[in-house]
Every structure is written in C-alpha cells, then in structure tokens.
Amino acid sequence: MKSWEIAVVLVAAVYLCSQVNFVAGLECYVCSNQTGNTEKCLNTIKTCEPFENVCGTEIRWGSQPYFSEGALKQYYVSKRCMTKEQCQSKRKRYMQLYCTHIWYEDWACNECCKGDRCNYFVISGAPSRQGYGVCLTLLTALLGLGSWLIPRS
C-alpha cells in the first residue's frame, strides 16, 4: 500500500469510530430531592432504558415539599435518565422562567448531558464520551499495521 492509501484508511477509521454508538445502555447518576450533590447522588448509578438517551440534573433552591415564600430554604438535587426531548423541554422551561439563582426566591435549573455518567457534577456541561477507548485501540492498531506495510529504505 502507498502512504496516501494508508492515510485514507486511517482517516476513514477515525471517522467511523466517531460515528459508532455502542449497544450498551447509557449510565447516569440518579437521585431524587437530595439536600446536596453528595452520597446518593454520587454513588447511585442506573443503566437507562433504551429510549433514554441523556442524563438530566436538576438543582432547586427552596423549601420542601412545595416552594413557599418565607419558609426555610436549601438546595435540592435530582438526577435521572431522560429522553433528549424531555430534558430540553424542562431546561427551556426552567432556564427562561425559574433559573434565577436569587437567594431569597425559590428557583430551579436543569442541565442535560450525553455520555456515561456525565451528570456527576450538578451543572456539569461534561463532554460526551462515546467509545473513545475502542477507537484509540483501533487507531493504534492501524498505525502499527501502516508502519509495518510501509517499505523501509
């Protein structure tokens, strides 16, 4: 094989790896109305249903069980598996109306992320990690094969 052919094969392999979605279900941290991002919210992991394709995190500041003016306020964290549509709808609703971070008012914010356990942090913005270990292994093997095929002078 010529060196440009090897380069084309490597580029194609990298592209294919970036497009791979593995069958294993998404894993998200899950908890409900915890008083912080500790213990249960950092230790409970769920394999999501096949139709659930994002992890959602909600943080609220207010009183429980219902927000009420003048009551003792604190943070409440909830994490779950969701569909992208559910998460975006909730995020849009919260961010436009309720995500104020004003300490004397009740507020709520929602974050969506895609990738196994990406919702570790409360509002994470964590990047997606979709099988990059497998792709790196494949790329390393192809580079090794390419160096073996290129004639040495």
Swiss-Prot record:
- Tissue expression: Expressed in all tissues that form septate junctions, including hindgut, trachea, epidermis and dorsal pouch. Expressed in subperineurial glial cells that form the hemolymph-brain barrier of the central nervous system.
Q: What happens when the gene is disrupted?
A: Embryonic lethal. Aberrant tracheal dorsal trunk development resulting in tracheal tube size defects. Compromised epithelial paracellular barrier function in trachea due to reduced and irregular septate junction formation. Compromised barrier function between the hemolymph and central nervous system (the insect blood-brain barrier).
Coarse class of the protein's main subcellular location: membrane
How does this chain sit within the bilayer? Lipid-anchor; GPI-anchor
Q: Which residues are glycosylated?
A: N33
Q: Where are the transmembrane segments?
A: 131-151
Could you tell me which residue ranges are on the Cytoplasmic side of the membrane?
A: 152-153
Query: Which residues are the propeptide, according to the record?
Result: 125-153
Under CDD domains, the record lists: TFP_LU_ECD_Cold
- What residue ranges lie in the Extracellular compartment? 26-130
InterPro entries referenced in this protein's UniProt entry, alphabetically: Snake_toxin-like_sf
Q: Which SUPFAM superfamilies match?
A: Snake toxin-like
- Tell me the disulfide pairings in this chain: C28-C55, C31-C41, C48-C81, C87-C112, C99-C109, C113-C118
Gene Ontology CC annotation, any one = side of membrane
- Sites of GPI-anchor amidated serine lipidation: S124
- GO terms of biological process kind: establishment of blood-brain barrier; maintenance of blood-brain barrier; regulation of tube size, open tracheal system; septate junction assembly; wound healing
Q: How is it modified after translation?
A: GPI-anchored.
| Annotated family | Belongs to the snake toxin-like superfamily.
What job does this protein perform?
Answer: Required for septate junction assembly, possibly by organizing the preassembly and transport of septate junction proteins such as dlg1/disks large 1 and Nrx-IV/Neurexin-IV. Involved in paracellular barrier functions of trachea, hindgut and salivary gland mediated by epithelial cell septate junctions. Involved in paracellular barrier functions of the hemolymph-brain barrier (insect blood-brain barrier) mediated by glial cell septate junctions. Required for maintenance of septate junctions in imaginal disk epithelial cells. Involved in the epithelial cell wound-healing response.
Remaining remarks = The name coiled reflects the excessively long and convoluted tracheal dorsal trunk phenotype of mutant larvae.
Q: What is this protein called?
A: UPAR/Ly6 domain-containing protein cold
Taxonomic lineage from the root = Eukaryota, Metazoa, Ecdysozoa, Arthropoda, Hexapoda
The coding gene here is cold
